[in-house]
């Protein structure tokens, strides 16, 4: 057996030490590369690639950067709120003083329909840094989810006080006022939205609802038609102005005119039971019975506890001489109406 000399052994040790010293630098360089690529992907709007790259950067050097926060931001853009929540909880555990992570986590919990938890996180975040108008907007919307409109209005008012040009905060404040039948305040809020954006279809549609509640049908119809025209060409059209226009035409006994906007409402809001109910009712009134049955049955599948849907189904089955089904639906209507009456304070 041959033994290395002392010089040989010291040389090997020196080489090993150099390699050990190089490993952290190589890891750091690799982490920096993945992080930088993630930032580039994020800024270019490639959020799927960004989320993957930030995850790799975090795996290489756990807890040393804000890669988890950027990964969460990427996942929010991808509407993957559950994964975003996981990333933010990990980061907040390692960095409990990060107001950025907490505010984003509060938003994510709101989007997951967890308002109580969202409010708890916003309270923690506010202890670290004062909230922005957008933050207070989400706090207000958490209270909307909790059906607490008094507190919703309180925080939405604070949001627009802090950020008077926050169009979305003004819009949601208008909606909260409308839910409390504070029509004057609601109108002012929606008019403020239109002052900030003169072709905001949501605000114009809601002005139509106010006009309709004030028994001004012609002005309401005009507002709904404006909202439809203003959102035309948008990649994210809402079914609401079509639904509101068609519903008002039905109330005015103009069922033939109501069919077209209600068909468009169904096209845009295929999972909205009200759209199927209203177009089914329009078909029933224009004697298009098979189509009425189809739409009303779809509405019932989407919202089986809605008494109005069961009542219209009973009418269509009776008209089509399906008497057993008609009796069942009339009975179901009475049951749901009795239950609703019994639950009122």
Placement of each model-derived feature along the sequence:
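Structural marker of alpha-solenoid helical repeat scaffolds
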Residues: 60, 94, 128, 162, ...
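Helix-start (N-cap) detector for alpha-helical repeat units in TPR-like alpha-solenoids
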Residues: 31-32, 65-66, 99-100, 132-134, ...
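Alpha-helical segment of the N-proximal tetratricopeptide repeat
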Residues: 32-56, 60, 77, 107, ...
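TPR/TPR-like (Sel1-like) alpha-helical repeat modules
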Residues: 301, 307-341
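Structural signature of tandem alpha-helical TPR/SEL1-like repeats
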Residues: 44-52, 78-90, 111-124, 145-158, ...
